[in-house]
Structures are given as structure tokens and as C-alpha cells.
Amino acid sequence: MNVISVLSDSDFAGCKDTAKSTSGHIVLLNGGPIAYYSGRQTTVALCTAMAETIALAKLVVKIKYLRALLHDLNFCQTRETNVDSTIVWVDNTAALAVATGNDYTHETLKHVTVKVRFLQECVQRKIVRLSYINTHKNISDMMTKQSSGPQFKAHRDFVMGYTDIVVSHSASASFAVRVRRRTVRLRV
């Protein structure tokens, strides 16, 4: 069973010079990180929903590429429920509403219509399934914002492979995390 999960986040107007937002995500394959990204967005977002939507659109392009690559390597995504959607965890309910097409309209999102339509198509075709995650549990927060020392250390240890985080998905799309300390032995 190969399960691809992604945690996505964006800050809002984090750059003091340009007012551009920073996007970040961590891609997990069977609970272990295989890719991560943190970078400045190319356009200025007018609200947090727009910043998160821009981040999601860029992320879904990467997910489609990774799924094709993993398929070529015989790491097809399968689950016991026969749903092969990649689960993307997002901590912004407005961005979820925009991407899933749940009658959310906002004047400031008009000029990202193409990205919104792309996201909605990927959700409808079940390439991705978007789910909400509390911002305090979102590991990709470390890619976009400063965090407290203990929280940063826990997220850093996971990304660097010092701890395992087991991601479990229930039918209600809840997110559970179990952290297990990994022992690393080096031979010299």
C-alpha cells in the first residue's frame, strides 16, 4: 500500500519589501518525507485565501508530476478503500472552499480564476482530495513561518528523518499523528 499525503501552507504578505507571500509544502510517501519546498510566490496575494490558493495550484502541479514519476517506478498510490486521490492537508478553510467549488466567491480572487479552475478540476477528477488540518499540527508551517523552539525542533526532526510520523487517515478525513523516535546508527 502506497499512500501519498501532502501538507501545504502559505503565509500572507510575509516579505516586508515586496508584500509577496511564501508557499511551503511537505510531500509524504507512506509517512516519510520525500519532497519539500519553500519559496516566494510570484504575485502579490490580496488575502490569505488567495495566498493559500496560489500555493495549492503550484502544489497540485507538483503532485501530478510526482504521481506519474512514482507510477513509472511501480510505486502506484493505492489504498484499501480503492481511492487513489492524494490527500492534501490545508489549514485555511476559505482556500478549501475555493478549491472544492463550494459556492465561495470573493472579489479579490477574480484574477486567479485559471488557478482556481485548475484546482477544482483536479478535485473533481479525484487527483487530489483536500482536507482541513489545524495549523498547529501542520508540519509545513515550518516552511513559511517562524515557530516556537519546541515546535520547530519537532518539525525539523521529522523532516531530517530523526523521528517517524505516522499519518493515519480515517473515513472522516481526520488527521492523526504518532511520533516515534528513530535510532540512527552510523558505521565508521
Where are these predicted regions, by residue range?
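RNase H-like nuclease module associated with reverse transcription
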Residues: 3, 42-188
